[in-house]
Amino acid sequence: MTPNAARLLKKYGVDKAIGENLVSFEELNMRRKDGTPVGYTPISRVENALGQPWWLVHRHHLHTGLVDVARTSGCTILTASRVTSLDYQSSHDGKVTVSTEAGAQHTFDLLVGADGVNSVVRKAIFPSIAPAPPTGNCAYRAIVPYAEIRKHAELRPLVEKLTMEVWMGHDAYIISYPISAGKDFNMVLSHHRDPPVHQVQEIDMQELRDEYKDFDPRIKKIVDMIPSAQRWPLLYVGPLESWCSPKKNVVLIGVSSAPFPHTY
């Protein structure tokens, strides 16, 4: 949650709903793949310049906080209601009818499609547009508890403070940062595959370990501690003619309208 997003979380009280699971961190450190430092940013400098905190958060905790605040603000949230189709054109009064997997229908004056890269709403408005990888870049995602890392003396200096670390290699990089009240060491491990990856894939863990065998021995040891992981595609959509329907009764926001491939 960069400072611009943190400002909005604070405005609506979502920061209080998430609580300690919004993690503050001290530094952003850039390294070569062998661990040699090449750049350093104290996060306080960024926060002071922008007047807002920079937080790290697991998406589960973010979603839970958003749901809690929405409910206390009077919103009705329906679960087990996966949308399968929508009709936004046939109503004479411009209303939108949504059908769900459970067979229910709901009618609205305005439908906001914030349903991600595989958006059902976007597909209804722009059926010919589909997410695709612009390159062979993709990422493993994994979590290792800080408590496990601290059992190894040679790794403790790397985790004695809460920091964001980046190891940069040729066609590969690793980003790590703390989440879950500073209890979990989250990793995004970028790499390339040919042909490009279109969907989340299960992987052989030895493949992941071999991918980073020449990296800094410290992060390599943490990589070897990963119990399981998946390969995630980094997808792009667009360009779209518009982010709304011709009648302006359906609008796309967020990743449903403009996903970007380089993200952690």
Predicted regions and their residues:
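Residues in well-ordered beta-strands of folded domains
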Residues: R31, S99, R141-I143, W167, ...
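Short, conserved charged micro-motifs
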Residues: K151
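Rossmann-like dinucleotide-binding core of oxidoreductases
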Residues: G136, L155-M164
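A short catalytic or substrate-binding loop motif that flags glycine-/basic-rich loops and adjacent residues
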Residues: H92, V166-H170
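Conserved N-terminal helical subregion
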Residues: T2-E148, H192-L208
